[in-house]
Amino acid sequence: MSNVIENLGKLDRKVTLAIPKAEVEKEKQERLVRLSKTVKMSGFRPGKVPMKMVEKQYGQQVEFEVRFDKAARKFFDITKEQDVKVAGQPKFEIKNEGVGEDEVAFDATFEVYPEVTIGDLSAAEVTRTSTEITDAEVDKTIDILRKQRVHYHARGESGEHGDGGADVTAQNGDRVTVDFVGKIDGVEFAGGKAEDFPFVLGEGRMLPEFEQATLGLKVGESKTFPLAFPADYHGKEVAGKTAEFTVTLKKVEWAHLPEVNEAFAKSLGIADGSVEKMRADIRENLEREVKRRTHAMLKDQVMEALLKASELDVPKALIEQDQERLVEMARRDLEQRGMPNAKDMPIPAEMFAQQAERRVKLGLILAEIVKANGLEAKADQIKAEIEDFAKSYEDPKEVMRWYYGDQQRLAEMEAYVLENNVVNFVCDKAKVTDKKVSFEELTAEGNAQQA
């Protein structure tokens, strides 16, 4: 039966589309006429190729295109008329059996969107984390910023950077410059030799045995020592083997951290060099980071709660579409990292199957909960979020214009606000436990979740 949608399973459907051959032939001829005005053939001027030759050359291809175009249009009309919500793209197959002589027919198989049932959210349990930024956290951040701006002085300098003389031994925190050579069974190996090689003792850049051997040396002194490469060492040719190294210390430099003063504040973008303004800006940035992390942690819990509380079948077509999106995202990421030929890199879509299913499932759940409870993002909510984000920039008005000047960026902020609305809605119904943690605990927990 044509035009009747058959139920093949939970989400699978099929409809037979019958199209009169006369309609196909009529549109085919119209397209061939249009094509004849531009087609080029040897021996004829453009637009002067006889219709018989145009039809002989292109007739079969044009008829094929017309058949599928008409099938697609008819499919759209039928599903729209019967209010069927199609998930993904239909698959068309030419139907040969049971077809009238004056028509062509296709079987279109497709999936529909599922019914989404969201259970009792009052049973959901989430933890809402909060963190207070203290003066100690501001001080720690300043220390990190100072270390990022560290510069080194050679041992033995006099004046304000005097350090007790050049005869001191290398200590943790010093930057040392060394020559070294390594041998395995008396033979040098690739990567085992260097001259004027600098590194900072205690940073862990070198293997522990190498750093330990360098500690305590004075300029000009050498030491020979055994070094066992770990079995999982990145250099496969030496992994699991023991080498004999000789290291010679050529220079020792001590770390000089900048003072926290007007010049330091100006280096961080504080125009008037106010240390108090610098501290206030650092506190504000830390509070913004706290808001971002705590919101992300809460959102993840809410999404998991929604997944557990909801029942639905997920259309395979939507999963496959999302897998392809994730593949393209992976290729773009590799391209941005400088990977050669990233655009053509073969990335199997199957590796994203679970991630895609989860994303699609959450998307369907969110759409249902937003629609059922009127949680759409309002214009004033979007504006408020953009204004809050813009505060961290020197020219907030320019940031506002940047957002409102691009529909894609605006859509991303709308999605963020919509997610916030869902998170707040679920938290109002769920069992929420408030938990205070230090900034250090917050960052450690957030990093653990990302890992």
Swiss-Prot record:
UniProt GO cellular component terms: cytoplasm
EC nos: 5.2.1.8
Gene that this sequence comes from: tig
Domain PPIase FKBP-type: 173-258
Subcellular location: Cytoplasm
Top-level lineage group: Bacteria
Pfam families linked to this entry: FKBP_C, Trigger_C, Trigger_N
Chief location category: cytoplasm
Annotated HAMAP family: Trigger_factor_Tig (MF_00303)
UniProt xrefs under InterPro entries: PPIase_dom_sf, PPIase_FKBP_dom, Trig_fac, Trigger_fac_C, Trigger_fac_C_sf, Trigger_fac_ribosome-bd_bac, Trigger_fac_ribosome-bd_sf, Trigger_fact/SurA_dom_sf
Molecular-function annotations in GO: peptidyl-prolyl cis-trans isomerase activity; protein folding chaperone; ribosome binding
Protein keywords: Cell cycle, Cell division, Chaperone, Cytoplasm, Isomerase, Rotamase
Organism of derivation: Cupriavidus taiwanensis (strain DSM 17343 / BCRC 17206 / CCUG 44338 / CIP 107171 / LMG 19424 / R1) (Ralstonia taiwanensis (strain LMG 19424))
GO BP terms: 'de novo' cotranslational protein folding; cell division; chaperone-mediated protein folding; protein transport; protein unfolding
Function statement: Involved in protein export. Acts as a chaperone by maintaining the newly synthesized protein in an open conformation. Functions as a peptidyl-prolyl cis-trans isomerase.
Catalytic activity annotation: [protein]-peptidylproline (omega=180) = [protein]-peptidylproline (omega=0)
Domain remark text: Consists of 3 domains; the N-terminus binds the ribosome, the middle domain has PPIase activity, while the C-terminus has intrinsic chaperone activity on its own.
Entry similarity comment: Belongs to the FKBP-type PPIase family. Tig subfamily.
Cross-referenced Gene3D superfamilies: 3.10.50.40, Trigger factor ribosome-binding domain, Trigger factor, C-terminal domain
Name of protein: Trigger factor
